[in-house]
Amino acid sequence: MKRIGLKMAIVAILASSAPSWAGESAAVRNCTWCHGTGAQGYTVAPRLAGQRPQYIMSQIRSFREHARDNPFSKQYMWSAVAALDSQTARDLANYFAAIPPKGANDGDSTLASRGRTIYLDGIPEANIVSCYACHGPNAEGVRDIPRLGGLAYFYLKGRLEQWGQGYHSGTESPMPMVASHLGPNEIEALASYLSFVK
């Protein structure tokens, strides 16, 4: 009897630590077609696992309002979120935030040290500000500022390039202005470094 009771307690603990939404949810399945079965992301579709729920919510709102206007957003995300109600959006954000993220580790390791310096200190003489100031010392993000650590190199590189071209993430995002000061070498170094951050 004691052994059965212990097994039941273990099952209860494991169940309570899992994300609260079942993976069979239609809304979750719709997201994982592009973002991966474990929400760990692909080349152009970012990892959602472990992302800050406030950020996910803000981006759903930006897609719905067409404020996030890069090509992939227009082609896929504007229509993908059109039918989401506020409660489902919140549930999705909390579900994905609760999944343990895996690092991409796919950048150029020889550029990581340079990228770390740019991330922490910026390049003042080139008007490149520190990423640390907003995204935190370990690129973990805060509130609706996203977690960057461990995102895929090609996704990060592409987003930085798009911001530099004037595309937006939302009406209040400073990233187009910030990225406009980054050259190709700085972008490659930053994206490489961030892909290795735990």
Kindly give the residue locations of the regions a language model identified.
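Short cysteine/histidine-rich metal-coordination sites, predominantly Zn2+-binding motifs
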Residues: R47-Q54, C134, R147-F154
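Short microdomains enriched in Cys/His and/or Lys/Arg
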Residues: R52-F63, Y153-Y167
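The feature marks the first
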Residues: E24, V28-H66
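Electrostatic cytochrome c docking/interface patches
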Residues: A15-V28, G38-P46, A98-P124, P146
